[in-house]
Amino acid sequence: MAALPDKERLLRNFQRCANWEEKYLYIIELGQRLAELNEQDRHSENSIQGCQSQVWIVMRQNADGVIELQGDSDAAIVKGLIAIVFILYHQMTPQDIVNFDVRPWFEKMALTQHLTPSRSQGLEAMIRAIRARAATLS
């Protein structure tokens, strides 16, 4: 399985896509790169409310205080959006996550204006849930 790119490479790759069909395919590819989420982590505590699709996000804090994220969805495009969020929050502490605004990155990728309203709401729900959980750990 290929590793996820860093923030800058994600943005470059996104900008290299010729059209939105290519961007959607790239988002799906990113989702396919996520590590498999085990069945024990697919429970209501890790479920994200406000998403039309099933979404699970697991947050664990490692010994260095850095948050490690795992997630999955039953929808390919949503799984790709999870991957994008994970790329943006990669190697951050809980306080870093609380303080970091992902919206400028979404604007640079022109991401939200090309998502359906329900997917945009689901993306916002994921971000709110991650930030809320990070706030309890910081």
Curated annotation (Swiss-Prot):
Pfam families: SufE (PF02657). The active site is at C51 (cysteine persulfide intermediate). It is found in: Cytoplasm. InterPro entries: Cysteine_desulfuration_SufE (IPR023939), Fe-S_metab-assoc_dom (IPR003808). It comes from the Bacteria. Keywords: Cytoplasm. One of its GO terms (cellular component) is cytoplasm. Pathway: Cofactor biosynthesis; iron-sulfur cluster biosynthesis. GO terms for biological process: iron-sulfur cluster assembly; sulfur compound metabolic process. Participates in cysteine desulfuration mediated by SufS. Cysteine desulfuration mobilizes sulfur from L-cysteine to yield L-alanine and constitutes an essential step in sulfur metabolism for biosynthesis of a variety of sulfur-containing biomolecules. Functions as a sulfur acceptor for SufS, by mediating the direct transfer of the sulfur atom from the S-sulfanylcysteine of SufS, an intermediate product of cysteine desulfuration process. Homodimer. Interacts with SufS. Belongs to the SufE family. NCBIfam families: PRK09296.1. This is Cysteine desulfuration protein SufE.
